Amino acid sequence: MIQMQTYLTIADNTGGKVAQCIKVLGGSKRRYAKIGDIITIVVKQAIPNSSVKKGDVYKAVIVRTSKEVRRKNGTYVRFDDNACVILDANLSPRGKRVFGPVARELRDANFMKVVSLASEVI
């Protein structure tokens, strides 16, 4: 569960390293976001000479959360960190690679491009 002020790692090769959630999209009173939800982030750390700079604001999709997610078969899946992938205006990923595993719930949220770029889908 991601809420405002939550720090996340950026799991793509755009050059950003750490981001902070500044808004959970999908309703004026919405407080939490889970895997597959779109949030607005601000880049807090970035590597030099990258396409994203510190202080830039983007939309991102959540690909990993530390809070467990219950699946229909009764199993739970959770990850070691909270991570997101930066999106462009068309809600497709800005980067060409996705680092680390991503959750299968992204398939249900219609982020097939992110799933295909990921090295491992759990």
UniProtKB/Swiss-Prot annotation:
Stored Gene3D superfamilies: Ribosomal protein L14
Transmembrane segment boundaries: none
An annotated GO BP: translation
Alphabetized HAMAP family for the sequence: Ribosomal_uL14
Similarity comment text for this entry: Belongs to the universal ribosomal protein uL14 family.
Subunit: Part of the 50S ribosomal subunit. Forms a cluster with proteins L3 and L19. In the 70S ribosome, L14 and L19 interact and together make contacts with the 16S rRNA in bridges B5 and B8.
Function: Binds to 23S rRNA. Forms part of two intersubunit bridges in the 70S ribosome.
Name assigned to this protein: Large ribosomal subunit protein uL14
UniProt organism field: Borreliella burgdorferi (strain ATCC 35210 / DSM 4680 / CIP 102532 / B31)
Gene name in the database record: rplN
